[in-house]
């Protein structure tokens, strides 16, 4: 009887350790985001990517940065298939997930911050078909770009505040009477 009770207690203890141990959780929202500034992971099925929807997304996201004398895309777009969207890519700093399904009634764009990493912007574009979603994304292109650009600016400001230059920040304050953190790079 004692032996059976001891075996049950050990199994319960081991089970609790496995469930509670953070090593078995692949994603935590406290993890640092990966990726370079202005880099975007687009999670999109091949059929949607080679359609009007994919062309629309590329035209919006890869449009040239204004006021530059040579072509430079607004975002470096990396498209991956949904089945390849796993732990490392889920922690990217900018993610756009494209979901096309006849079960979806109306097209929509949804934004979530710090979904699987910090700092992160996680956007879901969904619609009933490629054509309808392409139209919706095109009509809301300014909102899409605003969210992505603002996230990048906010990250840069946060970095500058966290790691101000020890030589430049006091110099700017002395010369212009403005206290503003300036990063070294």
Locate each region found by the language model.
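N-terminal targeting sequences that direct proteins away from the cytosol to non-cytosolic compartments
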Residues: 21-185
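Bacterial Sec-dependent N-terminal signal peptides
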Residues: 1-31
């Amino acid at each position: 009887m004692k032996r059976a009770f001891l075996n049950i207690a050990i199994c319960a203890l081991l089970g609790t350790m496995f469930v509670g141990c953070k090593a078995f959780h692949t994603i935590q929202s406290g993890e640092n985001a990966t990726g370079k500034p202005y880099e975007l992971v687009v999670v999109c099925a091949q059929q949607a990517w080679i359609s009007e929807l994919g062309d629309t997304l590329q035209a919006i996201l890869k449009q040239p940065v204004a006021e530059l004398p040579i072509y430079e895309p607004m975002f470096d777009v990396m498209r991956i298939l949904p089945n390849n969207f796993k732990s490392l890519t889920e922690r990217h700093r900018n993610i756009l997930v494209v979901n096309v399904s006849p079960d979806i009634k109306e097209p929509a764009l949804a934004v979530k911050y710090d979904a699987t990493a910090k700092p992160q912007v996680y956007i879901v574009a969904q619609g009933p078909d490629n054509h309808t979603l392409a139209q919706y994304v095109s009509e809301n292109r300014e909102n899409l770009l605003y969210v992505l650009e603002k996230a990048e600016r906010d990250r840069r400001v946060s970095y500058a505040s966290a790691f101000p230059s020890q030589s430049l920040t006091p110099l700017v304050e002395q010369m212009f009477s403005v206290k503003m953190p300036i990063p070294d790079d």
